[in-house]
């Protein structure tokens, strides 16, 4: 009898030990978004991005996807104006990896097939020369009316170059380090009302 109790006790100890060693594994992460809100309906020119950009690496093409980035433009009309011009220029476009590698990606910006560069202005509207802005044409029609006019259009954003460490350029994006890159892409808009 003592042997049976001892054997049952040992089986229970071994069984209990096995259960104690099998533990659930859980993981938790917290995502935090920075948030701001802004309303400006009085400035002569207001440009508002409509969304954010997210580039994903695709192994099949060894590259990143491109993105359409929409924006809203609002202008205050000037009843004395005889012409209107709207231009854009790239200000910042570098994303930096969020680790110690220093890897960078440069974002290219196109407007209707024309590159938006840091070195010069891209003409979006120029009523004096017959450039009426495509999707932005309501601005070309409303610049000389004494109220606000809005229109929406978009840029095409794509990854155009990168580095593995901030200096060594890559020609094959598959050689980039794994990770996440972050930064700002900023485009300056200039509007001119000619009287």
Curated annotation (Swiss-Prot):
UniProt signal peptide: 1-22
InterPro entries with a match to the protein in the record: EcpA, Fimbrillin_EcpA_sf
Highest rank taxon of the organism: Bacteria
Transmembrane segments: none
Upregulation: Negatively regulated by H-NS. Positively regulated by IHF and EcpR.
Pfam families recorded: MatB
Cellular-component GO terms for this entry: pilus
Key words of the record: Fimbrium, Signal
Protein localization: Fimbrium
Family listed: Belongs to the EcpA/MatB fimbrillin family.
Function: Part of the ecpRABCDE operon, which encodes the E.coli common pilus (ECP). ECP is found in both commensal and pathogenic strains and plays a dual role in early-stage biofilm development and host cell recognition. Major subunit of the fimbria.
Subunit relationships: Self-associates. Forms filaments. Interacts with EcpD.
Name listed for the protein in its UniProt record: Common pilus major fimbrillin subunit EcpA
Originating species: Escherichia coli (strain SMS-3-5 / SECEC)
Gene field: ecpA
């Amino acid at each position: 009898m003592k042997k049976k109790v001892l054997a049952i006790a040992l089986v229970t100890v071994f069984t209990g030990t096995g259960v104690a060693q099998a533990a659930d594994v859980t993981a938790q992460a917290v995502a935090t978004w920075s948030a701001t809100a802004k309303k400006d309906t009085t400035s002569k020119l207001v440009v508002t991005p409509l969304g954010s950009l997210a580039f994903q690496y695709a192994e099949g093409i060894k590259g990143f996807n491109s993105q359409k980035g929409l924006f809203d433009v609002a202008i205050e009309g000037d009843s004395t104006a005889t012409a209107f011009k709207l231009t854009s220029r790239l200000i910042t476009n570098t994303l930096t990896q969020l680790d110690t590698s220093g890897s960078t990606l440069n974002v290219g910006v196109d407007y209707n097939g024309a590159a938006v560069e840091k070195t010069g202005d891209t003409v979006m509207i120029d009523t004096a020369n017959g450039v009426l802005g495509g999707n932005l044409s309501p601005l070309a029609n409303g610049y000389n009316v004494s109220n606000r006019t809005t229109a929406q259009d978009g840029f095409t954003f794509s990854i155009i170059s990168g580095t593995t460490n901030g200096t060594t350029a890559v020609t094959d994006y598959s050689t980039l380090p794994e990770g996440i890159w972050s930064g700002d892409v900023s485009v300056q808009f200039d509007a001119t009302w000619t009287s």
